[in-house]
Every structure is written in C-alpha cells, then in structure tokens.
C-alpha cells in the first residue's frame, strides 16, 4: 500500500511538473501567393508547409491564394498578411511611387512569361491590335508583361490600342475553350491548353527576350513587421531555402508534383512543370534569389514605362526610383544561413 501511495505521489508530481513546464507556441504567419488557383511559383510554399519544413522552424504558416500578385502586395502593405510572393516590377513601382514600406527578403529571378496566341497567323503586333488579351487583373503581373511588350515592341498603349480581359490565373482555360485568342501565360500553361484544345499554342513573344535579365518575383514584407518579428522572418527565409533545396533534388520530382496539387496541376502536367522550372532555376538554387542586376533592371524598366506614359504607368518621372539597398533586406538570409537545420 505504501508503495502504491509513493507511485501515485510520483505520478502526481510528474503531472504537475508537466503542467508547469511552458509550451512555446509556434509563430503564426499568413503568406499570400498569386492566382486563384495559385500559379505554379507558389508550389514552394505548399512544399514547405506539407513536408513539415515550416513546422521544423517553429512556424505555423497559413497560405492565402489571392487574385493576383499585385493584390497580394497590397495586402502586405495594408498589414492584412505577413508576406507575399509578388511581381518585382509591380513592387518596385509601388515602393517608388507611394513610398510603400516593403522589403524583399527572398526572390525568384527568372521570369517564364510568354505572350501567346491560339492562331499561328495571328502572332504579331498588327494582329494583336484591338484584340482582347487575357491577363490576371488590371495592373497585375500579367498586365505588366503585356504592357511592357506593347510599349517596347509594338509602340502601342495597353487598354487604348489593346484591351485586356482580367481572368486571374484562368487565362489558359479561356484560351483552350476558344473564349479568347491571346493571353499572357506561364510556360506550364502551354501543355495543358494544347491537350484541352487539341491545338498548338503559338508564342508571340518571350518576356525574357523583350526585357532580358529582369527580375521576376519577390517575397516581400513590411519593414515594421520584420523589425517586430525578425526572428520569425529569419526562420521563414530558412524554410524557403530548405524547400527550394528539396525541389531541386531530381529524386523528389514525383513528390513535388503531388504537393503542387493546390495549383490544379496534377499527374504528367505537374511533373512537366517541376522539371521545366527546375531546369531554368525558377526557384533559387542555393541562393537568396535577389540578384542586384535583375532587380535594378526591373526598376529601370519601370522608369522607362513611366517616361513613355508620362506617369500613367511605371515609376512616375516625378518620383525617385527605389535603390537596391532600399528595396531589399539581405540580413535575414545571412542569419538564416547560420541556423539551417
């Protein structure tokens, strides 16, 4: 009986000790990704979440798909989300024109955009004039690519000479069904459209050829939020690095393709996308993905757009363009490298 009493007392003590031991809550973050459904670039967030990488760094991340990367950037600026994957050219314009307190903390350098047509005989500036072109949203990422192409190659004005049709990330579906002939696409849209329509998709222009060396996407956050939760953001950057490393291992192709399910790419389409994007280092391979030359090319392009449109688009000529140092926070990456798990 005495032995039983001792055991019970010990059990009670252990239970009391466990109750008294503090449990450290995971840091909650909401991160926005462009497109409904999400574009394939956002796959990296689902990889980090669903393989437990975020959890490994004590992060509880909610991924929020938004109509466009532009809308996602505005959500960061308003404080309604903690970070977003947003088009670099939109962000540098936003910071330059409005003084938005945004910092790029990670990035994707290589754009995959193409201007495409379902008709081989309609693949020129003359053919696109007056035709509706599928984009994500007004002044969204696809809209910006079209505007750049029209201004640089066609000497035309978007909306005035070429109207746009906002469709979030459903441009490909609209082209496959015959609703529109022209659209701004990601390369992973092409095989899906061709299978659905039974027709070939024709490339009118590659944005990488129109504006060589321009930066594609930035993971952005408000400077004040970074200051307030810096340790959490360091761990977030570390998680992005680990997820990118996982994606770049060819042995993980099938696994990554399955994790891309939220993008609505499945089976062979998802495997095609993973391989194609890995080849072009769509997600950075061992780097931060915020190369100075590409980011400053994005700034220069938006300065040019601003001059050509007299401030109606791009960076307003009356504003001072953002510098590389103002646009980026590289210190999070440096600290993240010290704590890679």
What are these regions, as identified by a protein language model?
Residues 170-264:
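Pocket-lining segment of extracytoplasmic ligand-binding domains
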Residues 227-312:
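Secondary-structure end/capping motifs
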Residues 9-19:
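Bacterial N-terminal signal peptides
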């Amino acid at each position: 009986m005495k032995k039983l009493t001792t055991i019970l007392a010990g059990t009670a003590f252990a239970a009391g000790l466990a109750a008294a031991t503090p449990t450290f809550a995971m840091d909650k973050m909401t991160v926005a990704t462009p497109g409904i459904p999400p574009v394939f670039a956002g796959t990296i967030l689902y990889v980090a979440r669903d393989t437990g990488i975020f959890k490994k760094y004590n992060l509880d991340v909610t991924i929020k798909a938004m109509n466009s990367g532009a809308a996602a950037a505005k959500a960061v600026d308003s404080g309604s989300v903690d970070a977003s994957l947003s088009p670099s050219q939109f962000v540098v314009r936003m910071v330059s024109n409005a003084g938005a307190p945004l910092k790029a903390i990670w990035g994707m350098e290589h754009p995959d955009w193409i201007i495409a047509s379902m008709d081989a005989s309609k693949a020129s500036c003359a053919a696109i004039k007056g035709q509706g072109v599928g984009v994500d949203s007004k002044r969204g990422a696809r809209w910006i690519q079209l505007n750049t192409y029209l201004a640089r190659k066609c000497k035309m004005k978007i909306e005035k000479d070429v109207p746009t049709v906002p469709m979030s990330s459903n441009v490909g579906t609209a082209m496959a069904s015959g609703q529109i002939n022209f659209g701004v696409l990601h390369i992973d849209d092409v095989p899906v459209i061709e299978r659905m329509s039974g027709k070939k998709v024709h490339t009118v222009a590659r944005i990488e050829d129109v504006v060589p060396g321009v930066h594609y996407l930035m993971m952005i956050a408000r400077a004040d939020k970074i200051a307030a939760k810096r340790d959490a953001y360091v761990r977030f950057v570390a998680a992005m690095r680990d997820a990118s490393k996982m994606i770049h291992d060819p042995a993980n192709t099938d696994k990554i393709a399955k994790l891309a399910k939220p993008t609505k790419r499945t089976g062979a389409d998802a495997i095609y996308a993973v391989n194609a994007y890995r080849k072009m280092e769509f997600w950075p391979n061992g780097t931060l993905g915020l190369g100075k030359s590409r980011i400053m090319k994005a700034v220069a392009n938006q300065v040019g757009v601003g001059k050509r449109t007299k401030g109606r688009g791009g960076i307003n000529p009356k504003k001072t363009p953002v510098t590389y140092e103002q646009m980026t926070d590289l210190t999070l990456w440096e600290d993240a490298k010290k704590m890679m798990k």
